[in-house]
Amino acid sequence: MKVLVNGRLIGRSEASIDLEDRGYQFGDGIYEVIRVYKGVLFGLREHAERFFRSAAEIGISLPFSIEDLEWDLQKLVQENAVSEGAVYIQTTRGVAPRKHQYEAGLEPQTTAYTFTVKKPEQEQAYGVAAITDEDLRWLRCDIKSLNLLYNVMTKQRAYEAGAFEAILLRDGVVTEGTSSNVYAVINGTVRTHPANRLILNGITRMNILGLIEKNGIKLDETPVSEEELKQAEEIFISSTTAEIIPVVTLDGQSIGSGKPGPVTKQLQAAFQESIQQAASIS
């Protein structure tokens, strides 16, 4: 397998990380995961733009253009002959003697690799269980940073409880999942938290909002309370690798009929169609 290290394609065994890389020591960096369908990077420009935004928000000046990044990632996918899978890319602030503050002029370190993705067909078709948990993350969740410790801990609690995802609540209001955006269908309207600093504005989320409008479904980007969530007709979550997955039980309680609902199914079908169109056009 080839990996990308600072613009160069090398064998994975040749790649190394300096012990004083600030990403390794502080989680001082940003990342993206981009899905590959039929050899095509889905939503590449949107992911690349968000990558640059995240870098700018934490003061990292990337030494390449969006076009350079897209070209390198496409080469990586081609070199590894990836048909169905994903690319993980991250940039750290660079290497420096360990201290919290940093000097200007550090050289950012960018790495990327490909991996296979198993489409969660069972989960998409039949739905999953989720739990709720308190959202104790920092208040810049709009930045896709490497700092994911609370997400990891909460996802593990969900896993140990036999659930697929943990839905996070801040002051009694739904923000998002540990690795997904969250939507509730209430009185036929799709409700989801607005894209502010409390959530990551997912690329899949943006696609879904476009599909909601295109399909004439009502949308309301306003926070959902815990009580509203548990009484919703439908709940679904979205992410790059999960796509759209129904939540049919929450904290052991059935949601709606306990099966994937009609709005979720409609959006799943529309999303799959958009994937096919993107893969055939490219």
UniProtKB/Swiss-Prot annotation:
Gene Ontology biological process terms in this record: carboxylic acid metabolic process; D-amino acid biosynthetic process; D-amino acid catabolic process
Pfam families, A to Z: Aminotran_4
UniProt keyword terms in alphabetical order: Aminotransferase, Pyridoxal phosphate, Transferase
InterPro entries attached to this UniProt entry: Aminotrans_IV, Aminotrans_IV_CS, Aminotransferase-like, BCAT-like_C, BCAT-like_N, Class-IV_PLP-Dep_Aminotrnsfr, D_amino_transT
Top-level class of the enzyme under EC nomenclature: transferase
An annotated GO cellular component: cytosol
Domain of life: Bacteria
Obligatory cofactor(s): pyridoxal 5'-phosphate
Positions with a binding annotation for substrate: 31, 98, 100
Protein EC: 2.6.1.21
Residues annotated as binding pyridoxal 5'-phosphate: 50, 176
Subunit text: Homodimer.
Name the record gives this protein: D-alanine aminotransferase
Organism expressing this protein natively: Bacillus subtilis (strain 168)
Name of the gene this protein is made from: dat
